[in-house]
């Protein structure tokens, strides 16, 4: 008897469902994508108990003809592709014909559909993949799919479900991203009878952003646009003052499909450069139109990973689109808004001074700042970075080799109290620094307001006035920016001549990194780093380039190897620019340091000559601005509608 058998169709569908259907959100994604492919203009998603009890998706699309209804539940039955060459010009969201049979195999599925050219519609009921009923019915044009008792015959899958709130959050995230990908479609999401999401479907991406994130956020989104012969990039990005603590608010779309792509995420951050604080991420919707021949979507069951030809050119296009758009914006943060944001943060406690004023006298419209209430602020009491102990000399007598030094990864230090938000691991910080350096090198000259200095507070903040109102400058951040640009400009071409080491260094790597570095060793050789094999997963360095100081060898080699593993290239300028960031931080004036008038005015003059005077190299704001209108609002000289009290006859 043969040991190899063909699996029953129901079992095969359940196995396929394990790849495609991970949770209720996966069902929602597949059904809504089918509705989008059917040219729907309205899609309603109704769920109960976060989709575990019921998911119902209703659309007004083309519908399914009666002859095709049963075929739609067969594996690999699809109307999207017909021959092999079609795989290279896919423009629909679905094409494999796996989703519907996979869903039907692990639930009770009810499908009602009708097309424009048929008198009657069709009702189909399947339970666990087996068709129980098919009949003609009267139903509106379009399709309604109901999925009940999800995972009823695969209880092991239910064990891995999180809370109802967590599963609901995944569903909302799916609908939000599909809404941003298709602003021309009106989406409605209802959970347990309560409407959670609703978009207008007018084709305006900014309007879709307002429907998902709120009007206040949509107003702070900046449009971007760029194109070349292969790609068209458009979308919206948030101003640098509007950030999140993770990448979840970055949406990348290719031909209307939401994808995940590490390199494109990096390109977005590169476009911001030092305008973002370290560890903060923007809200962004990047819509990329591309010839289907340049994108392969058939590489992952969920189709969220896409292989892109000419990926480096696309990265440059995205980065330049963002940088060009931000260059046109006024990037001095509004001080009144920041004051409202920090004052509502309950995690920080401040000593309060009693004033003979009622609390209600301070005028803020806090509803306008609701978006910021959920942000977390790290206390200045964050622990400082520590330095790893220096390497220990170890004598190796094998094969007559001289003494060698085992290299250790070291962490550069900076006065962390001057950057209370930079409480990151060494690896995270290096990645962030690498990310901003490229844009720091290419910054263009910005216009800076003409300021008149008139005072200092607590040896930390400088006060100046200009046509735009009152400006408050962080003296450490200001001098850090000035010194960074000074050190950066001193970085030029370096001498790759080599110098012999008296004591060679040994560098150990994980096995996978070691093999990758072996393949790419020629790239390291180009910048004067010559590593030789020395035992298992270990390289030995016997000489170093003259431009690299011996005390920097350990950290420099590890950092350049990390750079090579991450980006497939090594840039000496990039590495030296990271040093410039550290040097500017350590050698700048600190808080509680009193400046005389001459030094303060000179600092403002130097700041005005910087290419980017608005942010320190770490992304913190250098100055904030109180406009005259802000001051008048704080002192109640104008009302909410900006009507002057003098005009009202009350002053």
From Swiss-Prot:
The keyword Methyltransferase does not apply. GO terms for cellular component: mismatch repair complex. SUPFAM superfamilies: ATPase domain of HSP90 chaperone/DNA topoisomerase II/histidine kinase, DNA mismatch repair protein MutL, Ribosomal protein S5 domain 2-like. It holds the Pfam family HATPase_c_3. GO terms for biological process: mismatch repair. Keywords: DNA damage, DNA repair. GO terms for molecular function: ATP binding; ATP hydrolysis activity; ATP-dependent DNA damage sensor activity; mismatched DNA binding. InterPro entries: DNA_mismatch_repair_CS, DNA_mismatch_repair_MutL, DNA_mismatch_S5_2-like, HATPase_C_sf, MutL/Mlh/PMS, MutL/Mlh/Pms-like, MutL_C, MutL_C_dimsub. The keyword Ribonucleoprotein does not apply. Coiled coil: none annotated. Belongs to the DNA mismatch repair MutL/HexB family. This protein is involved in the repair of mismatches in DNA. It is required for dam-dependent methyl-directed DNA mismatch repair. May act as a 'molecular matchmaker', a protein that promotes the formation of a stable complex between two or more DNA-binding proteins in an ATP-dependent manner without itself being part of a final effector complex. This is DNA mismatch repair protein MutL. It comes from Streptococcus mutans serotype c (strain ATCC 700610 / UA159). The gene is mutL.
């Amino acid at each position: 008897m043969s040991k190899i058998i063909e699996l029953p169709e129901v079992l095969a569908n359940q196995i396929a469902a394990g790849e495609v259907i991970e949770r209720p959100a996966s069902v929602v994604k597949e059904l809504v994508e089918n509705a989008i492919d059917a040219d729907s203009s309205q899609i309603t998603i109704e769920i109960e108990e976060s989709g575990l009890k019921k998911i119902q998706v209703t659309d007004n699309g083309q519908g399914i003809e009666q002859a095709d209804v049963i075929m739609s539940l067969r594996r690999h039955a699809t109307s999207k592709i017909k021959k092999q060459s079609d795989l290279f010009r896919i423009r629909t969201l679905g094409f494999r014909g796996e989703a519907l049979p996979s869903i039907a195999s692990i639930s009770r599925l009810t499908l009602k559909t009708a097309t424009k050219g048929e008198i009657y519609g069709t009702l189909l009921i399947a339970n666990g993949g087996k068709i129980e009923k098919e009949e003609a019915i009267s139903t509106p044009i379009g399709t309604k799919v109901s999925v009940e008792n999800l995972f009823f015959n695969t209880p092991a899958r239910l064990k891995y479900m999180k809370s109802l709130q967590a599963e609901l959050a995944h569903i909302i995230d799916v609908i939000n991203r599909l809404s941003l990908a298709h602003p021309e479609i009106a989406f409605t999401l209802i959970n347990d009878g309560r409407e959670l999401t609703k978009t207008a479907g007018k084709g305006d991406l900014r309007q879709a952003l307002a429907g998902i994130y709120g009007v206040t956020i949509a107003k702070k989104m900046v449009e971007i646009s760029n194109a070349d012969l292969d790609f068209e990039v458009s979308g919206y990005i948030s101003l640098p003052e509007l950030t999140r603590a993770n990448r979840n608010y970055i949406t990348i779309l290719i031909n209307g499909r939401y994808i995940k792509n590490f390199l494109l995420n990096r390109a977005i951050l590169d476009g911001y450069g030092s305008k973002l604080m370290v560890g903060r991420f923007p809200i962004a919707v990047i819509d990329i139109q591309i010839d289907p021949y340049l994108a392969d979507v058939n590489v992952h069951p969920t189709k969220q990973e896409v292989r892109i030809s000419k990926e480096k050119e696309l990265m440059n296009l995205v980065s330049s689109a963002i940088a060009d758009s931000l260059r046109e914006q006024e990037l001095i943060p509004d001080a009144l808004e920041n004051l409202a944001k920090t004052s509502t943060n309950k995690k920080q406690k401040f000593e309060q001074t009693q004033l003979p004023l009622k609390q209600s006298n301070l005028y803020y419209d806090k509803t306008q700042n609701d978006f910021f209430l959920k942000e977390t602020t790290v206390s200045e009491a964050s622990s400082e970075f520590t330095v790893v102990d220096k390497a220990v000399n170890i004598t190796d007598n094998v094969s007559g080799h001289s003494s060698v030094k085992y290299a250790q990864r070291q962490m550069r230090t900076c006065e962390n109290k001057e950057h209370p938000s930079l409480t990151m691991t060494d690896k995270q910080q290096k990645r962030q620094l690498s990310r901003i350096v490229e844009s720091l090198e290419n910054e263009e000259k910005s216009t800076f307001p003409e300021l008149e200095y008139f005072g200092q507070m607590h040896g930390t903040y400088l006060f100046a006035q200009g046509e735009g109102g009152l400006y408050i400058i962080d003296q450490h951040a200001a001098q850090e920016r000035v010194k960074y640009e000074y050190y950066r400009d001193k970085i030029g071409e370096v001498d790759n001549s080599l110098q012999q080491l008296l004591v060679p260094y040994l560098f150990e790597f994980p096995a996978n990194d070691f093999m990758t570095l072996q393949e790419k060793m020629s790239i390291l050789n180009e910048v004067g780093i010559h590593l030789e094999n020395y035992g298992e997963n270990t390289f030995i360095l016997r000489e170093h380039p003259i431009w690299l100081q011996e005390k920097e060898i350990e950290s420099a080699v590890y950092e350049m190897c990390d750079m090579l593993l991450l980006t497939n290239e090594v840039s000496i300028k990039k590495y030296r620019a990271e040093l410039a960031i550290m040097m500017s931080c350590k050698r700048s004036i600190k808080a509680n340091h009193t400046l005389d008038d001459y030094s303060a005015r000179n600092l403002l003059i130097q700041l005005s000559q910087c290419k980017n005077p608005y942010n320190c190299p770490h992304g913190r704001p250098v100055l904030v601005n109180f406009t005259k209108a802000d001051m008048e609002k704080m002192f109640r000289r104008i009302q909410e509608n900006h009507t002057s009290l003098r005009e009202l006859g009350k002053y």
